[in-house]
A protein has these predicted regions:
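Short, surface-exposed "cap/lid" segments of acyl-processing enzymes
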Residues: 80-156
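Cap/lid segment of the alpha/beta-hydrolase catalytic domain
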Residues: 131-134, 160-181
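The feature captures the conserved acid-bearing segment of alpha/beta-hydrolase catalytic domains
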Residues: 239-304
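Active-site nucleophile loop of the alpha/beta-hydrolase fold
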Residues: 230-239
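Glycine-rich nucleophile elbow surrounding the catalytic serine of serine-hydrolase chemistry
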Residues: 207-217
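C-terminal catalytic histidine-bearing segment of alpha/beta-hydrolase fold enzymes
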Residues: 294-387
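Alpha/beta-hydrolase fold nucleophile elbow
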Residues: 198-209
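Alpha/beta-hydrolase active-site loop
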Residues: 174-197
């Protein structure tokens, strides 16, 4: 993996020189001051943008100069390709030198990995079966990304960063190559660059769906990760490829099990809805079982998502990540998750009643969501808990 980095930001102050040994306190203070200033700058300099789905479907291209003129960007050369990676930093809930990094799920439908083209929505057999086309084929408002970073920051009471994945959220590249070794290498290089820019000590990681696949690879390959939370992550599908092209080689989470199992510095946690239609539990739970066989027990929290596909567990992932960052026990996190499950079940039941009333009055005909079923009380599979 070849990586070169040019860190560009129109306004963010850069730290100069090295801090001498023994000056860790001063270094941390400087880093926190830089974070606070950076968070102020993002509120004033980074206006909301709408990233069009048509552009993302084609693949996002940019120049080094345009990247440098855009707030919160990194110009990286990874595996022989230039990328402009964008991120959104928040200190809404607090500041720290080990931020939470969030990686979102996949967008834009299904990829034909034989041709490496998008499957047209009319021909995509997964549409309306494993995903809602209206939810994935849509523009992205960068305000929403900042709000997500805010939510993680408030829950974990520290700095949080929404790191835009390849080809979406403001990062350049083609999202066709999501969950590949190229994307893993790109996100890893972005963490190195962010760490250098802000003087961070390390990171906590959180992912949703496809983002969790990348989280797993980062947790296995880095020594500076404390918490790693997989939300609805497809962690059991084994990919074989004879390609030597990192852009066409899918990440294989199973290969990471030995590294994670033996890395006692990382606390790995899973969040799963047993009724998930997008990434079934059978493609999540065996990862925890394989980890157990490798000598490492990890918590897996079973939850009830409120969307029709039982797949979006970001709210739960925020809660679990916050608990991990704040060093709560597995039991304490399980209690908090159980309370959230009950609250979401009450919300779903109320929504079902409102929809039924509207339908009865002839105002709406939408059927109640399947997530009004009884909640599973946030049950966990821990086999001894996390580390």
């Amino acid at each position: 993996m070849a990586v070169s980095t040019h860190i560009s930001h129109a306004t963010l102050p850069r730290r100069r020189g090295r801090v001498a040994s023994g000056a860790c306190g001063a270094a941390s203070t400087i880093a926190l001051q830089a974070i606070a200033l950076a968070a102020t700058l993002v509120a004033t300099a980074a206006c909301a943008e709408i990233i069009k789905k048509e552009d993302m479907l084609r693949g996002i291209t940019t120049t080094r100069d345009r990247c440098a003129a855009t707030a919160w960007t990194l110009w990286l050369n990874v595996d022989g390709e230039d990328f402009c990676v964008r991120y959104y930093l928040s200190t809404a809930g607090g500041e720290g030198t080990r931020p939470v990094i969030f990686l979102t799920g996949d967008h834009l439908g299904t990829v034909n990995t034989k041709t490496w083209q998008w499957i047209p929505i009319g021909e995509d057999r997964n549409a309306n079966v494993t995903f809602d086309p209206a939810a994935t084929y849509r523009d992205i408002n960068t305000d929403d990304l900042i709000k997500t970073a805010d939510a993680f920051s408030k829950m974990a009471k520290t700095t949080a960063i929404y790191l835009a994945r390849i080809g979406i959220g403001g990062s350049s590249g083609n999202h066709l190559f999501r969950s590949t070794l190229l994307e893993l290498h790109l996100m890893n290089a972005a963490l190195d660059a962010i760490k250098q820019r802000h003087g961070f000590e390390g990171f906590h990681l959180a992912g949703q769906s496809g983002g969790s696949t990348i989280v797993t690879g980062l947790a296995a390959g880095r020594s500076d990760i404390a918490c790693a939370v997989s939300g609805s992550g497809r962690l059991m599908r084994s990919y074989y490829s004879s390609s030597t092209d990192s852009a066409r080689t899918r990440v294989n989470p199973l290969e990471f099990i030995p590294s994670i199992a033996h890395n006692q510095s990382v606390r790995f946690i899973m969040v799963t809805d047993s009724a998930d239609r997008s990434v079934p539990a059978k493609e999540q739970t065996p990862f925890a079982e394989r980890m157990h066989q490798a000598g490492r027990d990890i918590p897996q929290y079973f939850v009830t998502a409120t969307d029709d596909y039982h797949h979006n567990v970001v709210g739960y992932t925020e809660l679990v990540t916050g608990g991990c960052v704040l060093r709560k026990s597995d039991a304490d996190i399980a209690t908090a998750v159980g309370n959230m499950v009950k609250g979401n079940a009450a919300y779903s039941e109320q929504r079902r009643k409102e929809i039924a009333l509207l339908a009865q009055n002839g105002i709406a005909s939408r059927q109640p969501s399947s997530d009004s079923r009884p909640a599973p009380e946030g049950r966990t599979r821990t086999r001894g808990g996390g580390t």
